[in-house]
Amino acid sequence: MKLKRGKPKEKFSYDPQKVLKKLEDLAYKILEEVKAGKNPYFDVPTRGLSNVYFDEEARLIKLGDKLSRRYFLNVAHARKFMQTLILMAYVKRLVSEGKHASLREAYYANKHTIPGTHENTFEDQSESDPIIEDLERMLGVLREEMHITADRRGYVYGDIVIKDGEDEFNASKLGMGGWAVPGTVEHIQFPEINVDYVLVVETAAMADRLIEEKYPKRERALIIATQGQASRGVRRLIHRLHYEEGLPIIVFTDGDPYGWYIYSTIKQGSINLAYLSEKLATPDAKFVGMTMDDIKEYGLEHVTEKLKGIPPDKKGGPTGDYKRLIEELNYPWFQNKEWQRQLKLALKWGVRIEQQALANKSLEFVAKEYLPEKIREGKLLP
């Protein structure tokens, strides 16, 4: 199976004026309702499992069309209504001035005592973060497009030129640590790409091993280390590299329910961020490993780890890894025969297999045999 760069399917262009227009339209709506003597309100798409579904055609977890109405003249709603307007004004200022703020900074910048009262606008960041998510859903824009960011996590290594503001650099010339993925990647451009595909790797240790073994250069691959669950910035970057630059996406995680869930969120999106799946998820992604079949195929039986928790056939079960496996068995996006086989084998054998277990063969085995052979032979899960 020869991987090669395909044709771009979409082109993203960040336009701050569109974000400002959406903010202003919503603000004018509230203003007109006040002028007309009406009770102003926001319609907020409802969060929660009851308003989430799997779109089989798009292969994405999506948010449904249920709305909750938040009124100003309602004791139960008034505080959140006020907080929403405060953060709308703050976002407008950030976008207009071209500045960015972290979630923590957004909280502190808008926390103050309301004049003439003993009430604070926000008591804790747990109040401001959900309002920012509400704005994402109401406006149909990413938090990052509103110039609000989270901490950096994950890094990129490979022969790709990245333009970040006024800086331009090759991600294979920055040392083994590569380029740290920022909280927002909306402004990032890719003037030159000399790779055939993206290999998304769960652990930094495995990514470092592949870099040390010269895998990116030899296989013309771009390595993206997620360092655990992929951050929004990493997921958005993966999405853009596939849809805008035509790069195939292959995911490599531990062979356990947590690693498979990491793959699931990259491919289909997540329930918590269902409203962002079309901008964060990459349904065309494929999975190379680790799988239960790898254990016997490569003679790794003696380096497996036991699943954590109580099995379903024992008193108090299922818990831990077993509970997550059963949940994944029932996910609509894991109903194909290939994934049903892997999940059922994990339950039957009661084991998990880590990426690093391949070092039992040799340090270079993963880079020179395991990955190249599986990818070349097309041994990938959907």
UniProtKB/Swiss-Prot annotation:
<keyword id="KW-0067">ATP-binding</keyword>
<keyword id="KW-0413">Isomerase</keyword>
<dbReference type="GO" id="GO:0003918">
    <property type="term" value="F:DNA topoisomerase type II (double strand cut, ATP-hydrolyzing) activity"/>
</dbReference>
<keyword id="KW-0460">Magnesium</keyword>
<dbReference type="Pfam" id="PF20768">
    <property type="entry name" value="Topo_VI_alpha"/>
</dbReference>
<dbReference type="GO" id="GO:0000287">
    <property type="term" value="F:magnesium ion binding"/>
</dbReference>
<dbReference type="InterPro" id="IPR004085">
    <property type="entry name" value="TopoVI_A"/>
</dbReference>
<dbReference type="InterPro" id="IPR036078">
    <property type="entry name" value="Spo11/TopoVI_A_sf"/>
</dbReference>
<comment type="function">
    <text>Relaxes both positive and negative superturns and exhibits a strong decatenase activity.</text>
</comment>
<keyword id="KW-0799">Topoisomerase</keyword>
<dbReference type="GO" id="GO:0005524">
    <property type="term" value="F:ATP binding"/>
</dbReference>
<keyword id="KW-0547">Nucleotide-binding</keyword>
<dbReference type="InterPro" id="IPR049333">
    <property type="entry name" value="Topo_VI_alpha"/>
</dbReference>
<dbReference type="Pfam" id="PF21180">
    <property type="entry name" value="TOP6A-Spo11_Toprim"/>
</dbReference>
<keyword id="KW-0479">Metal-binding</keyword>
<dbReference type="InterPro" id="IPR036388">
    <property type="entry name" value="WH-like_DNA-bd_sf"/>
</dbReference>
<dbReference type="Pfam" id="PF04406">
    <property type="entry name" value="TP6A_N"/>
</dbReference>
<comment type="similarity">
    <text>Belongs to the TOP6A family.</text>
</comment>
<comment type="subunit">
    <text>Homodimer. Heterotetramer of two Top6A and two Top6B chains.</text>
</comment>
<keyword id="KW-0238">DNA-binding</keyword>
<dbReference type="InterPro" id="IPR002815">
    <property type="entry name" value="Spo11/TopoVI_A"/>
</dbReference>
<feature type="active site" description="O-(5'-phospho-DNA)-tyrosine intermediate">
    <location>
        <position position="108"/>
    </location>
</feature>
<feature type="domain" description="Topo IIA-type catalytic">
    <location>
        <begin position="14"/>
        <end position="155"/>
    </location>
</feature>
<dbReference type="InterPro" id="IPR034136">
    <property type="entry name" value="TOPRIM_Topo6A/Spo11"/>
</dbReference>
<dbReference type="GO" id="GO:0003677">
    <property type="term" value="F:DNA binding"/>
</dbReference>
<dbReference type="InterPro" id="IPR013049">
    <property type="entry name" value="Spo11/TopoVI_A_N"/>
</dbReference>
<dbReference type="GO" id="GO:0006265">
    <property type="term" value="P:DNA topological change"/>
</dbReference>
<dbReference type="GO" id="GO:0005694">
    <property type="term" value="C:chromosome"/>
</dbReference>
<protein>
    <recommendedName>
        <fullName>Type 2 DNA topoisomerase 6 subunit A</fullName>
        <ecNumber>5.6.2.2</ecNumber>
    </recommendedName>
</protein>
<feature type="binding site">
    <location>
        <position position="254"/>
    </location>
    <ligand>
        <name>Mg(2+)</name>
    </ligand>
</feature>
<feature type="binding site">
    <location>
        <position position="202"/>
    </location>
    <ligand>
        <name>Mg(2+)</name>
    </ligand>
</feature>
